C-alpha cells in the first residue's frame, strides 16, 4: 500500500481475539500483530537528528567511568552518517548543551565531527542527577528541525538515581516529550534505578538496557547509531475505533517488550483513540493486546459483530497520518448459557509470558530490598512457569538460581545489584512462538540476553482456541477475570493467582 500512500514501508495486521463469547461475559481481548516490510519508497526515512545525553554527575567520578563515557560518545559521533544533525548535552542537576556552541543542532561533516569529539573530552563529573531536565533540554533542541520526516533520537546513560526531582516532575516532562522523539536509555554499574529507566524507555518508545562493564558502553553506542539509521518510518499510530457497545479498557504492547500503553493513547475523535507506536524498521513484528468491556444487553447474540476497527497509520513527509493497513476485531456472543468463551493460544501465551515477567520483577524487587526469602519464593515461581512454557528467559533465571541446603531453589550468592537490575529490565522482554522465531542478528544481540527477534519474524501463532476455565475474582473490585490474567480488566489490580502445575 505504500506506493499509494507515501509511506516507506508496507504494513500488515493480523488479529486473534476471544471471538466466541460466553453469554454472561462482559469483556473480550484481542491480540493485534503488526508486521512491516519494504515498501514502495526507499528506506531509510529522512535525516537523523541525534542528541547524546551524558551523565556528568559526581557519581561518574572514579572507576574510569567518565573516561569510558567520553570514549563512548566519541564512538557514537564517528558512527553517525554525514549530514546527520547532532547535539550533546552534559547533565547533572542542570542540562547544558556543550555542543554545538550555539543553540540548536549541527549538521555533521568532518569539521563538525572533530569539534563534537573535542567538546566531550573536557567534561568533568560534578553535581547531582535530574533526568527530566536533560530530556526537556533535548526536546527544545529538536525544535531546530521540526521536519516530519526527521528521525529524532536520544541516547541517555546514567549511573545513578534521579534524586534531584520528584517522580511527578519527571512524569510531567515525559508526558511533554512523548511522541516527540525516541529515547534509548542505559544504566551503568550498580546504583541506577531500573524501574525508572524502564518507565522512561517505555514512554519514549526506546530500549532500556544495563551496561555492567563500563568498557562495553562504546560498542553499545556504536550499535545504537547504526540501528537508528535503519529506521524507515519515524512515527506510527494504532487507531482503535470501537463499536458503540464496546469501550477500550487497556492497551499493552505484548511483544517484543511488554509496555503498558494505556496512558499513551490520544483522542482520535469520538470514541476513537490513537496510540503512538514510535518508529519502525523493515521486517519488524510487534504485538499489541487490547482489552475490551461491553454491556451484554447491548451486544446481540448469535451473530458475528465487529467490536473494533483497527488501523495502522504512518506519518509521512508532509506531517499527515496516512492509513497503511486495517483489520476488524470481530466477536460472536453465544445465545445459550454454558457455552464457554474460547481463548486463542496466542493470547494464552501472552498471559503466560506476563506472569513470568511479574514473578521475575517481584524476585528482583524483593532481593534489592533485602527480603531474601520472598526473592527465593518468587524465583521458584518464575522458574516453574518458565520451564512449563519453555520461555526464552529461562536461562537467565537458571543463571541466578542455586539449590540451598534444604534442596529448595534460592537466589545464588555473589550477585551484584547491577546484575539483578539487568534481570529486572530483561523481564519485560517477550518472544514469539518458538516455531516462528528466527535467529537474532549477531550485531544486535548483547551477550546474556533473551533472543531478540524484532527484525525478522514469521507468521503469528496459529494454535487451537482453548476453552476458558473458571476465572478469578479481583480482591479490590470483585471483577471476575479470565484465568491467567495478570491484572484486573476493570481496576488494574495485580492478580496473584498463577495456577502453576
Predicted regions and their residues:
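Exposed acidic/Ser/Thr-rich ligand/metal-binding surfaces
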Residues: 3-235, 297, 391
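Predominantly extracellular/luminal cell-surface or secreted proteins
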Residues: 14-16, 91, 241-243, 313-315
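Intrinsically disordered, low-complexity acidic/polar segments
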Residues: 22, 39-41, 97, 247-249, ...
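Surface-exposed coil/turn segments at beta-strand junctions on protein surfaces, enriched
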Residues: 23, 281-283, 481
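Acidic, polar loop-rich interaction surfaces within structured domains
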Residues: 173-182, 191-313
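Long, acidic serine/threonine- and proline-rich intrinsically disordered regions
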Residues: 294-489, 493-501
Amino acid at each position: 500500500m505504500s506506493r499509494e500512500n507515501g509511506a516507506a514501508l508496507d504494513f500488515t495486521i493480523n488479529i486473534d481475539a476471544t471471538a466466541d463469547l460466553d453469554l454472561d461475559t462482559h469483556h473480550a481481548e484481542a491480540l493485534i500483530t503488526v508486521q512491516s516490510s519494504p515498501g514502495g519508497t526507499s528506506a531509510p526515512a529522512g535525516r537523523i537528528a541525534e542528541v547524546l545525553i551524558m551523565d556528568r554527575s559526581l557519581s561518574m567520578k572514579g572507576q574510569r567511568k567518565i573516561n569510558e563515557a567520553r570514549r563512548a560518545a566519541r564512538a557514537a559521533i564517528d558512527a553517525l552518517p554525514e549530514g546527520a544533525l547532532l547535539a550533546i548535552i552534559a547533565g547533572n542537576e542542570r542540562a547544558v548543551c556543550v555542543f554545538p556552541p550555539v543553540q540548536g543542532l549541527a549538521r555533521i561533516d568532518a569539521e563538525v565531527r572533530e569539534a563534537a569529539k573535542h567538546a566531550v573530552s573536557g567534561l568533568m563529573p560534578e553535581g547531582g542527577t535530574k533526568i527530566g531536565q536533560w530530556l526537556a533540554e533535548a526536546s527544545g533542541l529538536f525544535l531546530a528541525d521540526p521536519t516530519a520526516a526527521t528521525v529524532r533520537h536520544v541516547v541517555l546513560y546514567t549511573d545513578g538515581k534521579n534524586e534531584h526531582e520528584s517522580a511527578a516532575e519527571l512524569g510531567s516532562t515525559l508526558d511533554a516529550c512523548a511522541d516527540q522523539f525516541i529515547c534509548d536509555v542505559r544504566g551503568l554499574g550498580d546504583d541506577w534505578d531500573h524501574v525508572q529507566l524502564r518507565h522512561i524507555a517505555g514512554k519514549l518508545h526506546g530500549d532500556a538496557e544495563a551496561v555492567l562493564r563500563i568498557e562495553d558502553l562504546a560498542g553499545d553506542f556504536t550499535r545504537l547509531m547504526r540501528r537508528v539509521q535503519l529506521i524507515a518510518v519515524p512515527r506510527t499510530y494504532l487507531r482503535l475505533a470501537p463499536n458503540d457497545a464496546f469501550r477500550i479498557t487497556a492497551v499493552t504492547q505484548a511483544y517484543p517488550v511488554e509496555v503498558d500503553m494505556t496512558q499513551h493513547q490520544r483522542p482520535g475523535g469520538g470514541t476513537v483513540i490513537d496510540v503512538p507506536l514510535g518508529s519502525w524498521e523493515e521486517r519488524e513484528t510487534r504485538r499489541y493486546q487490547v482489552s475490551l468491556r461491553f454491556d451484554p444487553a447491548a451486544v446481540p447474540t448469535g451473530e458475528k459483530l465487529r467490536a473494533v476497527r483497527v488501523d495502522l497509520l504512518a506519518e509521512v513527509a508532509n506531517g499527515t497520518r496516512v492509513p497503511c493497513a486495517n483489520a476488524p476485531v470481530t466477536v460472536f456472543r453465544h445465545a445459550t448459557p454454558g457455552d464457554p468463551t474460547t481463548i486463542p493460544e496466542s493470547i494464552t501465551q501472552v498471559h503466560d509470558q506476563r506472569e513470568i515477567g511479574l514473578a521475575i520483577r517481584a524476585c528482583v524487587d524483593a532481593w534489592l530490598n533485602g527480603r531474601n526469602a520472598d526473592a527465593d519464593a518468587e524465583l521458584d515461581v518464575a522458574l516453574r512457569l518458565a520451564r512449563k512454557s519453555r520461555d526464552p528467559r529461562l536461562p537467565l533465571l537458571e543463571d541466578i538460581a542455586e539449590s540451598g541446603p534444604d534442596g529448595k531453589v534460592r537466589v545464588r550468592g555473589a550477585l551484584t545489584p547491577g546484575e539483578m537490575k539487568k534481570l529486572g529490565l530483561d523481564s519485560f522482554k517477550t518472544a514469539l512462538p518458538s516455531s516462528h522465531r528466527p535467529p537474532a542478528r549477531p550485531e544486535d544481540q548483547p551477550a546474556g540476553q533473551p533472543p531478540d527477534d524484532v527484525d525478522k519474524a514469521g507468521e503469528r501463532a496459529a494454535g487451537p482456541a482453548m476453552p476458558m476455565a473458571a476465572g478469578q475474582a479481583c480482591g479490590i473490585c470483585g471483577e471476575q477475570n479470565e484465568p491467567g490474567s495478570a491484572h484486573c480488566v476493570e481496576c488494574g489490580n495485580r492478580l496473584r493467582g498463577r495456577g502453576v502445575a
